[in-house]
Amino acid sequence: MAVITKIEVQKRTKERFNIYIDKGQGEEYGFSVNQAVLIKHGLQKGLEIDEVEIANILYNEEVQKAYLQAISYLSYQMRTKQEVEEYLRKKEVGQAIISEVISKLLHDRYINDKEYAVLYVRTQSNVNQKGPSVIRKELLRKGVQEVIITHSLQEYPKEKQVDNAFMLIEKKKRSYQKHSFLQMKQKLEDMLIRKGFSRDVIQICLEELKEEKDDSKQQEALYYHGNKYYEKYKKYDGWTFENKMKQALYRKGFSIDEIEGFLQMKCEEG
């Protein structure tokens, strides 16, 4: 049995206290605790505590320390329950203490996966124009439950998905001006798949793109690639030249009619 002889505020940290005890051989330093632990255990001068109680105090001190670490981690941005658990494990906090800390954080509403998922969907759809499947995968990696993700994605209606997908198309299609319409369409489709949009949404956007097809741009692209391949293959004669030109331009996404029209033009020029 020991008796608390003195409680002293630490000089550098006003919320921490040094506890001095007497085990029958005079006053000695016992341990230090956070203010929350001091209050929880009602520590005061003259209080008698045994080894079991001291062990309990020190355990709660570790819990409080981990709790404050988690609060600091959460102060920068919202986190999921799994992210906080992983952070504490990296800090070499024991699983029993992590469980207690998570329970307290949930109770105090410092972590809430439902609120996190809704905010994440809004941010990723409005700011980064990501598609639903990519957002779903990212939330799953963060440990959010499938049912919560499905509910949160209701914040991302199909109309908004189409708007975002078409916005991405408008930004990207400028870089494909020297490609055939078919090749540009394929590249844009691949980009939207990577961004997480459904086939249905992509099809709607590509149909709109088809209606906006600029024949003059298609012709420019045909002339650009056609003249490039013409210089490359003009050393060949007859069928070999024609076959190589057709294969090269067809791979670039031009139709047979477009290719034959170009070859006819070059023939008339030549």
From Swiss-Prot:
Function text: Modulates RecA activity.
NCBIfam families in the record: PRK14135.1 (NF010733)
Organism: Bacillus cytotoxicus (strain DSM 22905 / CIP 110041 / 391-98 / NVH 391-98)
Assigned keywords, A-Z: Cytoplasm
Gene: recX
A Gene Ontology BP annotation from the UniProt entry: regulation of DNA repair
PANTHER family: REGULATORY PROTEIN RECX FAMILY PROTEIN
Family to which the UniProt record says this protein belongs: Belongs to the RecX family.
InterPro entries: RecX_HTH_1st, RecX_HTH_2nd, RecX_HTH_3rd, Regulatory_RecX, WH-like_DNA-bd_sf
GO cellular component: cytoplasm
Keyword match Cytoplasm: yes
Stated name of the protein: Regulatory protein RecX
Pfam family, one: RecX_HTH1
Disulphide-bridged cysteine pairs: none
Compartment(s) of residence: Cytoplasm
